[in-house]
Amino acid sequence: MKFLLHLSSFIFLLAACAPAPTLATPLPPSGSVLFEDEFDINTTGWDRFANEGGIMDYFEGGYRILVQRPGLNYWSTPEKDYGDVRIEVDLLKLAGPDENRMGLMCRYQNGNHYFFIISNDGYYGIGKFIAGQATLLGQSEMQSNEMIQPNMINHLRADCVGDKLTFYVNFTEIASVQDDDLSSGDIGVLAGSFSQPGVDVSFDHFVAIQP
């Protein structure tokens, strides 16, 4: 009986010392702003560099990506981490070829990410970049869409919710696909070139929202 009493006391002591279960942090209400940036100050965490390949930096109240080599992509993230997220940005081609890439990205982890892009000549695509390989989702090549306005400010929105990826251009949904390879990660902007260098893009009014 003494052994049983000691044993029960030991079990009680272990239970008393055990850490309380960790409660999951509740998600912000739908529509809550998680992060926003007007790029008015240059200390909000985006990349700042210049080399022979191009430039990424704050520029005249926006964020600029200049790509000086053909077949090259640049992207930048503010070092956040979200699962489900809605991201929006205004972008404008400053100079360079109309055949370009410019857009948003979500669930960035170790280089892997989903991307939502348009070109200044009116094409769009949703895809993923995994292990150094870019793959379009739901389409074999970039498709044209009349909602894309060449040489004007275009408002992009990307919803990354569960395995559903939805792309909006100028407040109109243009594509939606499903993929479950990536579940969470950083957010950001990107620009890239095809055969011609000199892609020069400005981003502004970046916001991340709880879906």
Where do the PLM segments sit?
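Secretory/extracellular carbohydrate-interaction modules
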Residues: 67-131
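Short, aromatic/His-centered strand-loop micro-motif at the edge of beta-sheets
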Residues: 132-155
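Short carbohydrate-recognition loop motifs
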Residues: 54-73
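Bacterial signal peptide processing site
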Residues: 18-20
